[in-house]
Amino acid sequence: LDRFLMRLSLGYPSRSAEKLLLQQNSRYALISTLKHVFNEQEILAMQQLVNQVHMADAVLEYLLNLADETRKKQHGLSTRGLLALKKAAQAFAFIQQRSFVTPDDVQAVFVAVVAHRIGLSEAETVQLMQQVHIS
């Protein structure tokens, strides 16, 4: 797993959750209360299924066009960033219970995957994405 794949904001915890955190003697005390949702084998199996999500040539071209548009700026999307965008779009399609990626999947993850890589605000990244037409 790549912890730098996306920039996500979880927001602030509720007041009661923050109070509970303040009352703990150790900032790790609550970790022992967490329950896992998937085991290691299930995660690896899902990663394999995500790898099998098909991306048509037209969607690959859309990815390349998006990358080209970012590269008109000072810090364009790297090839590694482009691969991350592809993988995130595949994962999003998988979560939507589809075996193929649509341009909407790419758009759904674009800002979270790309904005922090190219040094633009979320609004600027959305504007950049809207300049690229889907063929």
Regions inferred by a protein language model and the residue ranges of each:
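Conserved AAA+ ATPase core "coupling" helix
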Residues: 1-53, 57-65
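A short, mixed-charge helix-start or loop-turn motif at secondary-structure junctions
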Residues: 49, 70-72
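C-terminal engagement/docking regions of AAA+ P-loop ATPases
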Residues: 72-135
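Surface-exposed beta-strand edges and their flanking turn/coil or helix-capping segments
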Residues: 23, 68, 121-123
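Short alpha-helical scaffolding segments that buttress acidic/His motifs in well-ordered protein cores
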Residues: 22, 63, 67, 106-114
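Residue-level marker of positions within ordered structural domains that often coincide
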Residues: 9, 68, 94
